[in-house]
């Protein structure tokens, strides 16, 4: 009788390639990573360790995320790069200019929960639908208010989650959206 390892081809027996499990980042983790990346594309070890505590990710995964994000930025900046997402939806709303990040990592004891969702404060009237435009590199909204996923004090008209704005079909598209729409503030604490 064959053992379970022998019976399953490619599983630890050397018969096939071993595929590493792909890391799936939560919206909250991506918001935090993108925010720091916008200020420091080459974070030092203390910044990466702080991000590891805040996002509940291993420091090594954070380091790899930054390497991949820098490569993506270089790829997106190449002339002639195909970018079909430059058009704004006709009924999309503009977001206010003032960033709102109520969380201060230097004073707060509320870490980012890995399953949190980012929330955006919208300037749209409550009865209308805000379609989040997907913009290419070099384009931006008139501004964006980002409420930290772990607190929404002082925010009004908040979408219940980022999933209402952007479908969760591709981490690449979500990462592009966060990168192009996030406003960097309060990064001097690093």
From Swiss-Prot:
Annotated region of DNA binding: 18-77
**Spans annotated as Disordered:** 1-20, 76-123
Extract one GO BP annotation from the record: oogenesis
Per its UniProt entry, which superkingdom is the organism in?
Eukaryota
| Record localization | Nucleus
Classification via InterPro entries: HD, Homeodomain-like_sf, SEBOX
GO cellular component: a single term: nucleus
Where does the UniProt entry say this protein principally localizes?
Answer: nucleus
Q: Which GO terms describe its molecular function?
A: DNA binding
Organ and tissue specificity: Expressed in brain, skin, ovary and liver. Also expressed in maturing oocytes, eggs, zygotes and 2-cell embryos, but not 4-cell embryos.
Q: Which SUPFAM superfamilies match?
A: Homeodomain-like (SSF46689)
> Is Transcription included in the keywords of this UniProt record?
yes
Write out the biased-composition intervals (Polar residues): 106-123
Q: Which CDD domains match?
A: homeodomain
Q: What keywords are assigned to this protein?
A: Developmental protein, Differentiation, DNA-binding, Homeobox, Nucleus, Transcription, Transcription regulation
This chain's function reads: Probable transcription factor involved in the control of specification of mesoderm and endoderm.
Family per record:
Belongs to the paired homeobox family.
Instruction: Tell me the protein's name.
Output: Homeobox protein SEBOX
Native species: Mus musculus (Mouse)
